[in-house]
Amino acid sequence: MKSIWRRRDFLFQSGGGISGLALAHLLNQDGLLAASQPAACDAKAKGYNPYAPKPPHFAPRAKSVISLFMSGGPSQLDTFDPKPALTRYAGKPLEGKGEVVVRQGNPGPLMPSPFTFRKYGQCGMDVSQLFPNLAEHVDDMAFLRSVYGKSNDHVQATYELNTGKIQMGLPSVGSWVTYGLGSENQSLPAFVVIYDHRGGPLGGPANWSAGYMPAAYQATVFRSAGDPIIDLHPPAEIGPERQRDRLDLLAKLNEIDLKNYPGSSELAARISSYELAYRMQGCAPEAVDLTRESEATLKLYGMDDKTTEPFARQCLMARRLVERGVRFVQLYHGGLGQQNRDTWDAHDNVKENHTYHAAEVDRPISALLTDLKARGLLDSTLVVWHGEFGRMPISQKGVGRDHNPGTMTVWMAGAGIKGGQIIGASDEFGYKAEQQPISVHDLHATLLHLLGIDHTRLTYLFNGRNMRLTDVYGELIPQIVA
């Protein structure tokens, strides 16, 4: 610990402070050195490199993942899992399902969807009126209608979808993927999070933390508004030679400590993070520069519409990142603010809430799938859409819906997945997963499998135990991996 503080003292005393040297988002405790003269985008990492490409356990179907996280919990009943029984039994209590546990207030009567559904594609998939653009892709999408979670609390449920457990402090799925496979681009982070312009999700950075792993495996946060990467450039008075000299000197100090404490994986990861920050100077600005896109592409995503522009920007950045070898990109839609307005948390009015939020994402997500397919990237990219839980078939406050971890719909596309299929089913009211219930561990095991990773073999030794993303659970979803 003393040597770490000496390095910090050196940084401050050498002028400019950490803010002038750091990519603050890459390493919260120490920051990362930046350079005013960037390294080449194909530069190789020096010394120990946690991002070095690692061989998969078997031939992968996907190289990258784009996770589309709809914060707040979209309603499966009003999007991709229609329930005619809700119309037949509208206004009646939900019976025969045991104790009905709600998050707020008392259980209301059964409430039909305020949205109409129609069939799309050669497969005849039912999709609500909320997603007219996305519905055109159903033949490339697999709908998992029986995914369930353990908590009806936003924070706990979000942690579960990201880490497999409802408590904080564990490595996220993106961290596990980075740890298991490394990165195909040594000048960009392997794991990137881009959250909503209104703010990050409930639970904050613990959702993309590396937990008990070295900090190098946590996500790098890119902003969806303004400069995507903060603190990328040092102060103008610090020239490239001076900056490079500082980086080299700091690396030497770290190397001395690494020799004295060879078991310090955190220190080794910190050294590699400094080098990554230096290399990012060259290619990160280009990777997120949307002005390089054609007018037709910008319009396709909805950059010309103030409603769709924020999430269009996130989706377009995601495509550019996976195109450049970034392994795991997670986009959050719905941010902190007024929870019932700024997220999919439709306690008050599901029609008003979901109409508003679906309009923000329908066109951009549709464009993302179109663009990936046109560029030949969809076969090597797994796209996953979900929230933290589903919603209740009973009403809340007359026209809203409460949280429901009992079932939700997740869809997947790309990675050679057979599209146009429905996997699993919820009960007649959409209250509980009934046919082929799919746990979050099953979801994670399947995601890792598509990347060529056996979830039972991907382990990290912590406190004397070989830890897994899926703990001692997790079954592959056969229709997805077939």
Outline where the language-model segments fall:
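Ligand-binding pockets and gating/stacking loops
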Residues: 1-482
